[in-house]
Amino acid sequence: MKFYRCSSPAPRFQAVTPGEKIRETSVLTSLVQPGAREKARQMVSGSSNDRFVVSRRRTGFGDCLWSLAAAWRFAKQTGRTLAIDWRGSCYLDEPFTNAFPVFFEPVEDIGGVRVICDDDINTRSFPGPFFPTWWNKPSFDCIYRPDEQIFRERDQLDQLFQSQRDSDANTVVCDACLMWRCDQEAEREIFRSIKPRPEIQARIDAIYREHFEPYSVIGIHVRHGNGEDIMGHAPYWADTERALRQIYNAIDEARSLSHAKPVRAFLCTDSALVLEQVSVKFPDVFAIPKQFQAPQAGPLHHPALGAEGGFSALTEMYLLARCDTVIRFPPTSAFTRYARLFAPRVIEFDLNDPGRLILIEDNSQALMAS
């Protein structure tokens, strides 16, 4: 096998997550109450001069955490309080429940930034004016946000972050996919600072001891979509048979690398079809049992599953990060961002040529060719 050194930085994927398509409801806009009457909007803890960054997401954990890192970075730079509002999560069937404390331990500070992340978010309100300016509208006008507005806000937030300047607004609302809007150190700070709830961590540790510890584990994440609009990931699935061959090739290449222990493959996917096909090709592959949607029926995780869907997702996300080698297909998926930052060896697919593999090891990159 030849390794061709790649001097350019890792590809900056500009994928738009399916979460961008979610329409807003009055339940989800109740956090921010624009208009006059500032005194009625004061936080319980402070004055009308307090300033905030509100990180609001309802999508998968990868997008939620990456976008949270971008919001945290801005809060850190500007001395603001960070509020985490994950109501309406795709992992819960309770729209008024903040998903963050359901899945993660409470945290009051992240890297010197004060954090609000409890379920009292329903009773809190934040002082105006707001940025982006759309949030200064009366609450009734905030019931629905068209896709164009969400994308516009994403770009406005990106410009604000890139400017390295603060906003005159008292509250900055980050309610868009903010992948690639912060440096890796900000992402690492988030993952170091927040911890899954003890019952989730216990599940992760138990599976690791039994199925991972005796082996050099190759973690394989395959984001298929199962009929969902996967948007930025779609080019990787333009030809399903070709995509599966690329995955098989990546597994073979990963197995051919040096390993300290006997090799075991661990598959995480949102598609029963992918699990079936990969298991036929590699009968020894290991997967955690979970409930799949019917073929082409849409996303793996949805509110009807309740919190168990979130427990399952976090278990796989954190186990992937503890693998010796991780294969990311496609590399545009935020679900494996944690693994990308912490796994010792990662294999990705070239954005411009998905047939080519990129080996990332010890912070260096190489193109893999057989």
From Swiss-Prot:
EC number: 2.4.1.-
GO terms of biological process kind: oligosaccharide biosynthetic process
Residue ranges of every copy of the GT23 domain listed in the record: 47-361
GO molecular function: hexosyltransferase activity
One protein family per Pfam: NodZ
Keywords tagged on the record: Glycosyltransferase, Nodulation, Transferase
InterPro entries to which the protein is assigned, alphabetical: GT23_dom, NodZ
Enzyme class: transferase
Primary role: Fucosyltransferase which adds the fucose moiety of the nod factor on its terminal reducing N-acetylglucosamine end. Uses GDP-fucose as the donor group.
Similarity comment: family membership: Belongs to the glycosyltransferase 23 family.
Descriptive protein name: Nodulation protein Z
Lineage: Bacteria, Pseudomonadati, Pseudomonadota, Alphaproteobacteria, Hyphomicrobiales
